[in-house]
């Protein structure tokens, strides 16, 4: 009887020890691998959910509006950031867009507290010089919006939200109009990225969504010196927010 109890006791201790070792390995050694595995599983669920969703519906509401950039304010922004010199050698709208996007991309991502008070390109840049922690994707998009508009490049700030209403994480990017290609394309100054198909054609948000649904190739390109290491994780992230 004593031998049986002793055996049971040793077995329980061994199981507890193995559990502790397993937890420590997951926590300190294989933490990134486990997190990526869990994210991949969740990411595949996002893709399946997106595949069951409806297509974008055309809006029947006709709203007359005009992208306004007062000449004096636009010149102030161009002079402050020296945009005319930056894009003078650009031979198309897309090249100019990427040159300007690097300004916003130079500010790193964070959700600061306190947040900026004034949301215009110049004040956001001044704020970033005093706060090394940076700001979030929405603020990046607002800054890029004003920078592009000041040189006459039409663009929109687009909020991309998940279907899960309890998920408070969304992503905000810019949709830029390229007159040479007669289309809108996505630019993400927060993650320093834009998307193309296998032939290098620039993609809009709607085209990205369609390609994820159809499981077709999307390439996530970096427009800065930083490389995009886990494109598959970025793919899953977009599946969640489209």
Could you tell me what each predicted segment is?
Residues 142-216:
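Hydrophobic/aromatic-rich core segments of domains that either
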Residues 205-242:
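Alpha-helical and coiled-coil interaction segments, frequently adjacent to or embedded
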Residues 1-24:
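N-terminal Sec-pathway targeting helices
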Residues 92-103, 139, 143, 150, ...:
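Extracytoplasmic/secreted proteins, especially bacterial periplasmic and envelope-associated proteins
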Residues 40, 44-135:
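Secondary-structure boundary elements
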Residues 133-137, 158-161:
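Short His-Asn-centered micro-motif
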Residues 18-39:
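Membrane-interface motif at the C-terminal end of an N-terminal transmembrane signal
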């Amino acid at each position: 009887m004593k031998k049986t109890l002793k055996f049971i006791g040793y077995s329980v201790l061994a199981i507890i020890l193995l559990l502790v070792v397993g937890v420590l390995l997951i926590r300190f050694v294989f933490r990134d691998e486990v997190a990526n595995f869990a994210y991949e599983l969740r990411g595949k669920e996002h893709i399946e959910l997106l595949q069951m969703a409806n297509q974008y519906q055309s809006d029947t509401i006709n709203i007359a509006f005009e992208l306004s950039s007062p000449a004096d304010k636009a010149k102030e922004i161009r002079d402050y950031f020296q945009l005319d010199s930056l894009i003078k050698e650009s031979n198309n709208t897309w090249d100019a867009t990427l040159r300007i996007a690097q300004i916003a991309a130079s500010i790193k991502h964070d959700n600061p507290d306190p947040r900026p008070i004034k949301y215009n390109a110049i004040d956001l840049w001044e704020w970033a010089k005093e706060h090394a922690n940076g700001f979030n994707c929405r603020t990046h998009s607002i800054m890029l919006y004003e920078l592009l508009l000041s040189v006459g490049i039409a663009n929109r700030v687009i909020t991309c939200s998940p279907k899960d209403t309890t998920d408070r994480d969304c992503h905000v990017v810019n949709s830029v109009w390229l007159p040479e290609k007669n289309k809108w394309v996505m630019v993400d100054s927060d993650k320093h990225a834009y998307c193309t198909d296998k032939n290098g054609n620039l993609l809009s948000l709607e085209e990205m969504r369609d390609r994820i649904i159809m499981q077709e190739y999307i390439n996530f390109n970096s427009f800065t010196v930083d490389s995009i290491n886990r494109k598959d994780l970025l793919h899953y992230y977009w599946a969640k927010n489209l």
